[in-house]
């Protein structure tokens, strides 16, 4: 995957958490994950991204034992209804990654710290031969927004991701996907600059993941809540721009809308 991807995929967000910022994405209770996954796959999801630890700005720390419990239970449910769909695990903890990779195949590890938070993560991912999403952020969910200071956000994010991708590859990670980290240690202006400059990050030669779905920089600009219909409209407009910038994967709450956006984009540009 270390070349621009000749495809565009939809990654559906499935949160096995009680505190993710977009309440409808939370899958709690008996069978909730299975229902959410089945719905996402029916709407055209290529990948299902499961998280047991909300990493929104200001989120509370979750003990590793609780994250493990949530994630393993969620993957078990997901695999029952979608045995052949790629599963992505949204975690920065090697214990969680290893618990899933040792039990299931066709798994991606989506690490918001690009392997920096846990020194064993790269070893685990390389050992199991899993693809890895490496995201740009600063600090922790508790401190990140106080660290949103850049001279040139696009250049600095690009430089960071280039270094991390090279390092991960040198440590044996065979498939690296880059994520500029929209909303993570970024101001509203930084996020829009990254949308505009996404193609310069794509020039590094790795597939790009864009995770902008209903995020606060869209909602603040439009003066709406994440659950508002205009938040989806804004997301869709910027998804188009991300696709123009070379995004290979859209990480989304609204699968059908993202799938339609990709279909129309490819029709427009005869791709």
Language model features by range: what are they?
Residues 52:
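Glycine-rich, histidine-containing beta strand-loop boundary motifs that form or position
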Residues 9-13, 45-49, 84-88, 106-108, ...:
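Structural preference for beta-strand elements that scaffold enzyme active sites
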Residues 1-5:
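N-terminal and secondary-structure boundary signal
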Residues 18-39, 55-81, 92-97, 101-104, ...:
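Active-site-adjacent loop and "lid" segments of alpha/beta metabolic enzymes
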Residues 182:
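Active-site segment of SDR-like NAD(P)-dependent oxidoreductases
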